[in-house]
Amino acid sequence: MSACMSDPVHLSIDDGIALVTIDNPPVNVTSRAVREGLMAALEGAQAAGVGRVVLTGAGRTFVAGADAKEFSAPPQPPHLPDIVSRIETFPVPVVAAINGAALGGGLELALACAARIAALNATVGLPEVTLGVVPGAGGTQRLPRLIGLENALSLISEGKVIGAAEAEKIGLVDALADNPVEAARRYSWLERPATGALRGPVLNNAAIEAARKQVAKRSPNQIAPQKAIDLIEASCTLLLNDGLEQERAVFLELKSSDQAAALRHVFFAERAAMGQGKTGGADITSAVVVGGGTMGAGIAYALAGLGIDVALVETDETGAARARANIAKLYGEAVARGKSTPEKAEADQAARFRFHVGYDALPAADIAIEAVFEDIDVKRAVFTALDAALPETTILATNTSYLDVNRIAEVVRNPARFLGLHFFSPAHVMKLLEVIRADDTSPETLATALRLAGRMKKIPLLAGVCDGFIGNRILTRYRQTCDIMLIEGALPAQIDAALRGFGMAMGPYEVQDLSGLDIAYANRKRLGWKTKAGFRYIPIADRIVDETGRLGRKTNAGWYDYEGSKASPSALIDAIVIEESKRAGIERRAFSDEEIVARATTAMVEEGLRILEEGIAARSADIDLVMIYGYAFPRWRGGPMHWAGRVGLSEIERRIAEYAAKDPASWAVPNLLARAATEGKTPEDL
């Protein structure tokens, strides 16, 4: 007895055991068709009088949660909680054969089963809070009953995904097996209550309070993790059905919230970006990295971790020794984190790395990545040397943060194989990668770069050539807007506090102190901003560097004064700010936090719209990902462009027009915005 193989759920019966297989590629999400198929399969199994049901997934996934296509739509029957209840109350045991990832609704299905057998490489978790909701089919009520309060708090409120071995250790799965389906057919256990019939966990107020503090630190301003803790706490005292009713109400409330919409937007944007590296391009097996400093070493280490042989180039023996030390440090950190052993780390370094002084003896390589000082003449000299030393088929990539990629490409023989790869530091950790198309970059070169990004588990965002590309261009505009508010009446600590309140991880002046005031100072000198036509130059930051030598945390003084790691507002800096207002003939005025946030974020949006208008970015969602992953814009707000859509483009247009009336050198309504506001479009439509 079996269902049509084109159906997303198959039922087969052998020797009195029903095998129900969810087959909805690629990851067996619980779409409406799957839910209908599960109900039908259970009915068929019951009608056949089987003695056991084994529930599993086709391919390498059990069930990876809800169907993303249904996220924004009203729930359609049959609802997942009804299927979960049907499994839990089924007249014969249902055993979950967890053959791969069991996430979200997939784990909730497994929790309803009489037993859970997991493959050795299976993973389980309830990551719903990362999408702005809570589990909606019993996860917050059944999981604490099964594994205890503390374990459930950690898994659910943090959205953690754990491996099969850890799941068995905490009692989430009953056994591990090479073949979980066969093991589930034979598995025997003592009679025990269904998961939902177990007693609620013992209330532990200290554990709940600790979880709340941890969530507030890890996910500030986010609603879903705190709501999840509320529901887990309720599982200690409520009957199951009362807890399930409360959970479902919270789930449906959060599903329609702004935060859930923002996090869904980011989820889809990530999928679209990471999908770019899954087709086309060639595999990179060997690489040259020029520059063994923090950035270059991070890039080289990440490449070596993929099994790519790396030739690391420095200009002299001192630089080569520093590069070796930087690489050794990264491997040492991996050992300290338990990701490697001393023996393996030493063997990997010996197998993957060769260190070179100069370019004379470089091996042939599939790609060469430059990570040297941000000076166009230095970079052009590097690529002149690389072009002469390497085969004409080698892809050449610059890691510049701001510079004109087309000007650098002028020195190579075949500019079709040249592009920008803007990594973010530390390069082996940060997920963002801006992939810069030069005028002559070939589609094949782009495809290979995107394929490499996928192997590195980066989020690659395509960008055209302009100063700062997507992220640093918006950052520059954001900082300039904050500097203008300084000279008009705000102070650094107030601006930082207001933007942290909005959800930024750090304020702009805290960030500058962390990165070093000399970095932006050098960039302003390079661009000649003091005399740039049509640009409102604010000299405060340059005065701090020129007159005080304060460069930020590296000198224990910058925008703030420092005692160790503790920052405090600087009377000296505040005095310079106020003095600069007087020099400019500006009467200082009070700023509210709301005005600071509105101006700073609207500046990001205006610049983002110009980036779209000029074709530098292809999608507004790409801009959102750059700002979230590279510049700590709050994920739960969806990025600046998504945030603008929630505010409304008509309101953004009104604000910019108002700002432009007072400061036409800094503000103007982009043509793209004017059209979009008139036509009632959102940023996602542009």
Regions found by a protein language model. Give the residues of each.
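Conserved CoA-thioester-binding segment of acyl-CoA-metabolizing enzymes
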Residues: M1-T56, P78, D82-S85
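N-terminal glycine-rich phosphate-binding loop for ADP-containing cofactors
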Residues: D23, V50-V53, P74-H79, S85, ...
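Acidic glycine-/aspartate-rich tracts in secreted/extracellular proteins
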Residues: G59-R60
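Glycine-rich loop at the start of a catalytic domain that most often binds anionic cofactors/ligands
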Residues: V63-F71
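Gly/Ser-rich catalytic serine loop of serine hydrolases
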Residues: A96, G100-G106
